[in-house]
Amino acid sequence: MTRISFYYDPSCPWCWITSRWLTEVQTEREIEIEWLPFSLAIKNGELGGEDITGHLDTHSIAHRVLRVIEAIHAKEGIDRGELFTEFGKSYFIDPKLDDDNFFQATLERLNLSVSYLNELDNTDHDSALQQHIDDAVEIAGDDVGVPLIIFETSDGERVGYFGPVMRRLPTLERGLEIWDSLVVIATGPDFYELKRKRARRSKVKTTKRLFPELTKQPQ
C-alpha cells in the first residue's frame, strides 16, 4: 500500500488532470489518498482583492468552494476527494453549468442541503485552510503550488513534490506506467527534482471520458 497526500485547488486545470489520473490509477494499484485543500487565493495573497497572478476571479471562486468542502467534510463526514470530484465535474466537465449555478447543482447532485451555500462567504474556515497550506509548505517548501503530492520515502521521510503536471489525461495503461515509475523515484532517498518548461496549455476536457453520464448527447 502506497500512502500519499494530494493537495488541490479546485480551479487549477493541471490539478484536476493529475487528480483524475490518480483516481483512475487507484483502481489498479493499492493507493491510499488523503485529499487536502490548497487555496491558491491564500497562497498568493489574493483574499484582499489584489490580482497578483492574473487569476483572481478563478482563485476566488475556488477558495469559496474550499470553504463549502470543509464545511461539508466536517458536518457530513464526506471525504474531501469525493467532494472535489463532484465540484470538479460541475466546473470542468458539465457544459450546461456556468459560474452562477454550479454551486447549487453540485449540492443537489450530492443530495445535500442548499443551505451549504451560506458557507461560501464564511471566513471562519479560512484559518483551517491556511493551516493546510502551512503543513504542505513545511514539507515541500514555500516555492510550490498544486498539484502537490506528499510521499513517504524508503527512509521514512515525508517529501513533497510539485506535480506530476500532465497536459492531458493519459490512457489507463500509460497512467499506470507513470505511477509505477513515479513511486520508484519519489520514494527513493536520492531523487530531488525534475522539471521542464511549461509551453503548452492543459487539455482538461480529456478527463471527460471518466464521466460519460455528463457527456452523453440527448437522443
Question: Residues of each region from the PLM?
Answer:
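C-terminal cap of thioredoxin/glutaredoxin-like
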Residues: 97-219
